């Protein structure tokens, strides 16, 4: 694409993007290995014409004093080769241009490029050393940058830190400023044309589009690469040359810092529209100073862009350490504005050249006249060596006459004009209407190295497929240079010596480029190409017109692939080169081609030292004749391949391909650490068979022994008995496996310490279960001893639950395996109803007491859910079914029937969960799900007895349960708010263990403010407990069982007494008609605590207090904890309608947020607006305001505002706030946001809201999704209902955070901070009284993101790290 727009009709695609100038990128990316030393062939030993084609490596081609190494780049009319200077041993790049393929216009452009490069002598610009010309060819000898393109550097290493990017950008600025001071405009600045030398210093290349300009005069030629082109170029206007370079510099700086392009599009029209809009995204990690510099360089109006002087004085350029080289180069540039300053001659270099035998006067004459012949080239190379190494190594001049004149033979001169010339330069091949390639006129060979394999750097770029997209480097191609030249498995094509007919016989003094043709006669004028005219040339690779350049290096890839199709099939050369691969790359599990079992790997590793000794030198000598007859008179070597793995058909690479695989997708190489050879997949079975024996004799002896042992007559009874024992053993094994799977999927694992060791020894079982469910783990489950998230050895769910797991998207299987949709399962359950046993709570890591302890799991059957939805069975409560841990008593059909109604109880997620989001979801469940879980058996020394109830003191008959009208708003039941439940509606009393009460108990109504979470318990409430180093301080199962037994009798007595007492008080108050006095009498809460809470409501419809023994004595210190259950202890209450809550990460947004925000990536700062602890939506009739409070009121009272809100939200480090609803389920509560309407096809009611189009749903957050400025937010938010401009600004700033709640990222955009703080105060102080009884939720625009940010930052736990590293970003 870049090439198409850059070259125009008839352009010379040699450099850059195949543009008009052939200089292009003269230098290649580096090879992985050390360069191969060229063969030192004296000039006298080189024949004028070889009698036979020279094989590769046997005889090096030479051009004058240069010995050619290999091809490093190709274009349509030129080829770039790396060479070694025979005198100085310096590496150079030689661009060879075929003049016969150029028209007059393009030939003038080449002369212009040579003229411009002669004017540029700068440490950060590619240096021109020498120019040679024959009747047909032009040779440009330039500096060689071994570091390759900075584009490839970004591909391999990712974006740069700003410190390193500043160093590189300063060097680029000095070079461009130097050009501008010389009245030269580059016009093709991009990452592909920025090269790196051995010290990673910048070298600007490709002056094919450069031109001389006059200050104040405009240019009109469209040239350059579209992603880096200025908007005035896209508009076809005349433009100021330096301003175009400044725009390109802004794009280059963005690419260095971000590793991506600010403007990119799938088509040229899309790219043009984005560039002309001038809007781009600033990622959150970019500093404010760098953003300011980029914004002022990428300005649509050229007159408002920064100048080079302003860029040099910018604040971002002044950061960091002092750079004296930058200051010196800038000062020299300013001195060069008027006249050219010539460097003084180096006398040491001149003396060294005299010692070599070169005439000093001839050297001085060459330097003064800018001859750019071999004298000036040697001088320049020695000067560079002296600057770098401070040493000169004069060597003997090759055996050539000092006059450097050669008389070419007559036959050679005739051959140069004939067809025997083998110096091949690629030539444009036109495409006819039938899409057939037309052979060019003449019989000139196009390429001297048609049989060359592509260079490694060319393959790396080709595999990344797009030059303007940062891809993943492929270490398979990083082979040693001495092994590149002849890849095994392919017959080498012997190229003919391309330059031998020219080099030794060239008369340099007569064939030098004429000086008069290089000097401009006044102002050079060339016919300008039409603006945006589509080129008429088409390449072979189908990448678009002129898609290749001399710098591309991939010109021979297509031909190479075609040659592979014609050759015999075999192992791919890219894979068979494994001994030379220096780097070890981790295995990508998602693209791996099947993992072998552990035993096979161990056998292979134990015997891999023998793998080179398996083959026998003379196999027939060791094979007996009778065995040879059995083998069909075939030698052992011919039987190496199994019948199904013959060389023509075996799978030698990770993809089924018998040719050079050129994938279009990006991938990580899938070679394993243990691969000792590329054919390990093919030889694996053979190695396992032959690993223990290296000789056929051993196998034959073992076979004879087996025949002796089992070859005799065997009793039939013995065989029958053995067969029966085998069948019994198989049945027993199958039964045990089935029991283990059922037990693991239903009951949590036991907390005994031996289970930790068993878990550590069974990673393969977990992997097997994940593969059985077709779930690819995002990361292997850790085996840390204190990891409470991955304690069970196998958390495989029942088969019916796989539908729920896969419907969530790419959830993290290590945290959510076997966990169905929370909102779907528990949306309409009453509070005293517990989750079904199939949910096993595997991610909580809280384990059961012992095998012998009976467990009562309360579950709600589908009939209850249907009755709740229909509103018919009002008094239906959860039924408790005692389930024994022994799996033999559990029927799979019953378990499947329990799981069936939950499989479709939620909407599928709109996008996959990232590992970081899954971690946040686990954080929310771990922190708040064991609501009524008394941790006395874990940490008995941390809790006082007087404020703690018994661990299992809660039962469904305690009276804290929610009535079935909780789930649906049933109008007939609203008329009887205090009607007591009948005896038939109360579930029977079953003894429950402390573990089940901890896992399945509802949220307690409120937390007194003196309850704190100890630091050692904070790890249990955090998903990163395994990373904090906390040890496991839980009681052994025996002591825990004894503790449960001691408390059972006391608990039952206490429950009976309390129930009788509460019933007496209930009837007494009902008879007296005093419903208000229920609050202090039934709740058991003293008036001191009531006075300390600002949200106290004495209305009987809003009872918020229950017995203190149901209060969990732990909560996070600095986190907004879970909300209470706003229901009376007895009787029906007027409950607020419930809003549907999505099951997992992104879809659990409240519907109000979906109205207000078009992108869920902004939910980091705005999700808490609707579910804020300050927003209480449970107002009763005639009492709209008592429950409403503000943060200021809460802080004045010295408490956190989470005493009585039903919608208290926890701000975790991730995007997802935990929701606590009026439901008492243990996993996730929904927020009472909007009225529950008619249920959908899944039986779940969805709140009525304005229809929002699908494009407003969120997209996956990329690395740079922050909008450039606030105007972009206004455009997107104007059509959204209820979204204020302040919230739009907050949304624009929120996208900077990239889902990381840290001080630096959240507050990174400071431009709207002051006004948002002011708006925050107004909103919090004055918005609440306006709420009426019918208001179900507050619009998110009333609470700007910055207000929520302050709340999140103020309640962040001091010990929890909110860094990007732990978040997995």
UniProtKB/Swiss-Prot annotation:
Disruption phenotype: Mutant mice are born at the expected Mendelian rate, but 90% die on the first day after birth. The surviving animals show dwarfism throughout their postnatal life. They exhibit marked expansion of the growth plate and articular cartilage regions in the limbs, accumulation of chondrocytes in the sternum, ribs and spine, and impaired skull bone formation. Although chondrocyte hypertrophy and bone mineralization are markedly delayed, the body size is unaffected during embryogenesis, dwarfism appears as animals age. Residues 344-384 form the UBA domain. One of its GO terms (biological process) is endochondral ossification. SMART domains: S_TKc. Residues 46-55, 944-957 have a biased composition (Low complexity). The modification Omega-N-methylarginine is found at residue 1034. The keyword Phosphoprotein applies. It is found in: Cytoplasm. Phosphorylated at Thr-221 by STK11/LKB1 in complex with STE20-related adapter-alpha (STRADA) pseudo kinase and CAB39. Activated by phosphorylation on Thr-221. Transmembrane segments: none annotated. ATP binds at residues 72-80, 95. Expressed in hypertrophic chondrocytes in the growth plate. Residues 803-818, 981-993 have a biased composition (Polar residues). Residues 26-55, 775-821, 942-993, 1314-1338 are annotated as: Disordered. Residues 66-317 form the Protein kinase domain. The keyword Transferase applies. The active site is at 188 (proton acceptor). GO terms for cellular component: cytoplasm. PANTHER family: MAP/MICROTUBULE AFFINITY-REGULATING KINASE (PTHR24346), SERINE_THREONINE-PROTEIN KINASE SIK3 (PTHR24346:SF42). Binds to and is activated by YWHAZ when phosphorylated on Thr-221. Interacts with 14-3-3 proteins. Interacts with HDAC4; this interaction leads to HDAC4 retention in the cytoplasm. Interacts with DEPTOR, MLST8/GbetaL, RICTOR and RPTOR. This is Serine/threonine-protein kinase SIK3. It comes from Mus musculus (Mouse).
């Amino acid at each position: 694409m870049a090439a198409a727009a850059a070259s125009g009709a008839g352009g010379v695609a040699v450099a850059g993007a195949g543009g008009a100038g052939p200089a292009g990128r003269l230098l290649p990316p580096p090879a992985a290995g050390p360069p191969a030393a060229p063969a030192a062939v004296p000039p006298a030993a080189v024949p004028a014409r070889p009698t036979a084609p020279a094989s590769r490596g046997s005889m090096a081609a030479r051009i004058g004093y240069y010995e050619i190494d290999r091809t490093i780049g190709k274009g349509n009319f030129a080829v770039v080769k790396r060479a070694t200077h025979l005198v100085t041993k310096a590496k150079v790049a030689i661009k060879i241009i075929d003049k016969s393929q150029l028209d007059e216009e393009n030939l003038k452009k080449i002369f212009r490029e040579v003229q411009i490069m002669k004017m540029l002598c700068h440490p950060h610009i590619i240096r021109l050393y020498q120019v040679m010309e024959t009747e047909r060819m032009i040779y440009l000898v330039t500096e060689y940058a071994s570091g390759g393109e900075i584009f490839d550097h970004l591909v391999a290493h990712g974006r740069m830190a700003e410190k390193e990017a500043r160093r590189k950008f300063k060097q680029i600025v000095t070079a461009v400023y130097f050009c501008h001071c010389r009245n030269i405009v580059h016009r093709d600045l991009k990452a592909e044309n920025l090269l790196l030398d051995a010290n990673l210093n910048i070298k600007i290349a490709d002056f094919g589009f450069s031109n001389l300009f006059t200050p104040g005069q405009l240019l009109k030629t469209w040239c350059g690469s579209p992603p880096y082109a200025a908007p005035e170029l896209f508009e076809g206007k005349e433009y100021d040359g330096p301003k175009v370079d400044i725009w390109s510099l802004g794009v280059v700086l963005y690419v260095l810092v971000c590793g991506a392009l600010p403007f990119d599009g799938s088509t040229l029209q899309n790219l043009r529209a984005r560039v002309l809009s001038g809007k781009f995204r600033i990622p959150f990690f970019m500093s404010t100073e760098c953003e300011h510099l980029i914004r002022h360089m990428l300005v649509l109006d050229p007159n408002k862009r920064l100048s080079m002087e302003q860029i040099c004085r910018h604040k971002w350029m002044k950061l960091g350490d002092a750079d004296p080289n930058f200051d010196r180069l800038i000062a020299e540039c300013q001195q060069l504005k008027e006249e050219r300053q010539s460097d003084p001659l180096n006398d040491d270099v001149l003396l060294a050249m005299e010692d070599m035998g070169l005439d000093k006067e001839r050297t001085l004459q060459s330097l003064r006249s800018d001859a750019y012949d071999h004298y000036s080239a040697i001088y320049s190379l020695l000067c560079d060596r002296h600057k770098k190494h401070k040493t000169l190594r004069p060597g003997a001049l090759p055996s050539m006459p000092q006059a450097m004149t050669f008389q070419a033979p007559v036959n050679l001169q005739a051959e140069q004009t004939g067809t025997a010339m083998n110096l091949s330069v690629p030539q444009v091949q036109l495409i006819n209407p039938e899409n057939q390639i037309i052979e060019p006129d003449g019989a000139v060979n196009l390429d001297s190295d048609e049989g060359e394999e592509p260079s490694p750097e060319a393959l790396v770029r080709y595999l990344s497929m797009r030059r303007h997209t940062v891809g993943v480097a492929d270490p398979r191609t990083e082979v040693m240079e001495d092994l590149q030249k002849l890849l095994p498995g392919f017959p080498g094509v012997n190229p003919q010596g391309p330059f031998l007919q020219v080099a030794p016989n060239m008369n340099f003094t007569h064939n030098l480029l004429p000086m008069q043709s290089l000097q401009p006669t006044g102002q050079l004028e060339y016919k300008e190409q039409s603006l945006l005219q589509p080129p008429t040339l088409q390449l072979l690779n189908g990448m678009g017109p002129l898609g290749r350049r001399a710098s591309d290096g991939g010109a021979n890839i297509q031909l190479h692939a075609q040659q592979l199709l014609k050759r015999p099939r075999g192992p791919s050369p890219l894979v068979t080169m494994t001994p030379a691969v220096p780097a070890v790359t981790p295995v990508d599990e998602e693209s791996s081609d099947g993992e072998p079992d552990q035993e096979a790997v161990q056998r292979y590793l134990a015997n891999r030292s023998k793998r080179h000794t398996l083959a026998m030198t003379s196999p027939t000598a060791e094979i007996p004749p009778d065995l040879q007859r059995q083998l069909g008179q075939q030698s052992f070597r011919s039987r190496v391949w199994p019948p199904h793995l013959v060389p023509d058909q075996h799978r030698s690479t990770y993809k089924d391909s018998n040719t050079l695989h050129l994938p279009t997708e990006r991938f990580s190489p899938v070679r394993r650490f243990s691969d000792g050879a590329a054919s390990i997949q093919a030889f694996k079975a053979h190695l396992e068979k032959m690993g223990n024996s290296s000789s056929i004799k051993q196998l034959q002896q073992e076979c004879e022994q087996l025949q002796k042992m089992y070859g005799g007559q065997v009793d039939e009874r013995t065989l029958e008995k053995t067969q029966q024992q085998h069948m019994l053993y198989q049945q027993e094994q199958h039964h045990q496996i089935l029991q283990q799977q059922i037990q693991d999927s239903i009951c949590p694992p036991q907390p005994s310490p031996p289970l930790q060791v068993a878990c550590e020894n069974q990673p393969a079982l977990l992997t097997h279960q994940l593969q059985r469910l077709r779930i690819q783990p995002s990361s292997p489950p850790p085996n840390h001893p204190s990891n409470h998230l991955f304690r069970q050895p196998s958390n495989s769910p029942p088969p019916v639950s796989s539908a729920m797991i896969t419907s969530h998207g790419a959830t993290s299987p290590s945290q959510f395996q076997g966990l169905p949709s929370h909102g779907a399962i528990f949306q309409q359950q009453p509070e005293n109803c517990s989750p079904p046993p199939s949910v096993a709570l595997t991610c909580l890591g809280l384990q059961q007491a012992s095998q012998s302890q009976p467990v009562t799991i309360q579950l709600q059957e589908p009939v209850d859910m249907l009755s709740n939805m229909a509103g018919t069975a009002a008094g239906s409560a959860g039924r408790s079914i005692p389930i024994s841990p022994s799996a033999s008593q559990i029927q799979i059909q019953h378990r499947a029937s329990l799981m069936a109604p939950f499989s479709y109880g939620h909407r599928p997620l709109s996008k996959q969960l990232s590992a970081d989001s899954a971690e946040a979801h686990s954080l929310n469940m771990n922190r708040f799900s064991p609501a009524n879980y008394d941790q006395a058996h874990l940490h008995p020394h941390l809790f006082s007895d007087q404020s703690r109830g018994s661990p299992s003191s809660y039962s469904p008959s305690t009276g804290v349960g929610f009535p079935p009208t909780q789930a649906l708003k049933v109008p007939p039941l609203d008329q009887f708010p205090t009607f007591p439940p009948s005896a038939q509606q109360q579930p029977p009393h079953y003894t429950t263990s402390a573990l089940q009460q901890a896992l399945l108990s509802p949220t307690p109504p409120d937390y007194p403010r003196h309850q704190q979470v100890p630091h050692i318990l904070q790890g249990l409430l955090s998903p990163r407990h395994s990373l904090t180093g906390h040890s496991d301080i839980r009681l052994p199962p025996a002591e825990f069982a004894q503790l449960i037994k001691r408390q059972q009798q006391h608990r039952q007595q206490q429950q009976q007494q309390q129930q009788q007492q509460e019933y007496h008080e209930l009837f007494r108050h009902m008879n007296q008609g005093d419903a208000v006095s229920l609050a202090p009498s039934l709740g058991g809460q003293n008036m001191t605590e009531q006075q300390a809470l600002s949200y106290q409501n004495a209305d009987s419809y809003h009872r918020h207090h229950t017995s203190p023994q149901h209060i969990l004595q732990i909560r996070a210190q600095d986190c907004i904890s879970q909300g209470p259950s706003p229901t009376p202890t007895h009787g029906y209450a007027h409950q607020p309608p419930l809003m549907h809550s999505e099951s997992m990460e992104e879809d659990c947004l409240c519907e109000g947020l979906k109205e207000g925000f078009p992108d869920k990536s902004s939910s980091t700062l705005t999700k808490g607006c609707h579910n804020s602890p300050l927003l209480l939506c449970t107002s009763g009739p005639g009492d709209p305001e008592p429950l409403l409070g503000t943060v200021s009121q809460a802080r004045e009272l010295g408490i956190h505002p989470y005493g009585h809100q039903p919608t208290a939200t926890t701000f975790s480090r991730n995007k997802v706030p935990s929701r606590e609803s009026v439901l008492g389920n243990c996993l996730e509560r929904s927020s009472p946001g909007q009225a529950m309407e008619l249920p959908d096809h899944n039986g779940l009611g969805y709140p009525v809201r304005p229809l929002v189009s699908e494009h407003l749903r969120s997209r996956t957050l990329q690395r740079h999704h922050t909008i450039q400025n606030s105007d972009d937010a206004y455009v997107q938010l104007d059509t959204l209902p209820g979204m204020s401009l302040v919230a739009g600004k907050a949304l624009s700033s929120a996208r900077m955070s990239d889902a990381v709640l840290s001080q630096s990222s959240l507050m990174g955009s400071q431009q709207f901070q002051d006004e948002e703080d002011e708006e925050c105060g107004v909103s919090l102080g004055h918005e609440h009284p306006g709420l009426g009884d019918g208001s179900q939720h507050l619009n998110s625009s009333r609470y700007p993101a910055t207000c929520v940010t302050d709340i999140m930052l103020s309640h962040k736990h001091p010990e929890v790290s909110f860094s990007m590293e732990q978040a997995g970003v």
